[in-house]
């Protein structure tokens, strides 16, 4: 189910439903706040297995069945893809550093499931396909165990006093408050902080 559905689920009294036939709970499409994971597990006993993919990539990162998910992590790269996190200069990021999720392409051939370009739009295709990589436009960090943690879209980062702030990170902290059901963070220009 998409993350929006899980946010609706946790607002319901799930104890009045027979969920015994559900063996797995998966999600992708947008980041899911850890608080939603925790509330859903508390209500159902199920751990949501998060993943990441795009229309252009299919599922490229996931908490696959048989793996031990880390709550809030998208999981690990699919064996189909050589996923790396790159800094703005095209260098691989160190563990814990934020960078763009990219897929390395060998010999100029896209792996199975990865698109090869936008229909009749070479300019847009060239924006995402360059230097031997497909650039997703999404940012993440990779931890010491190889799990990826979603930060946000590159074009959705808020800059304040020279700091880069991911709205999802702030939303996740706010969602932990017991009296908050939903929240959204957006940037607003400030004359002093930018």
Task: For the regions a language model picked out, list residue spans one by one.
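Residue-level recognition of short loop/turn positions
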Residues: 87-89, 98, 144-145, 179
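Hydrophobic alpha-helical segments, especially N-terminal targeting/anchoring helices
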Residues: 86-87, 95, 136, 142
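Short beta-strand-to-turn element immediately C-terminal to the catalytic PLP-Schiff-base lysine
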Residues: 61-65, 86-87, 103-104
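Gly/Ser/Thr-rich phosphate-binding loop
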Residues: 1, 10-70, 82
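Conserved ATP/PPi-binding loop(s) of AMP-dependent carboxylate-activating enzymes
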Residues: 77-80, 91-127, 165
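Active-site glycine-centered loops adjacent to acidic/histidine catalytic or metal-binding residues
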Residues: 29, 53, 75, 138, ...
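AMP-binding/adenylate-forming catalytic core of the ANL superfamily
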Residues: 2, 103, 111, 124, ...
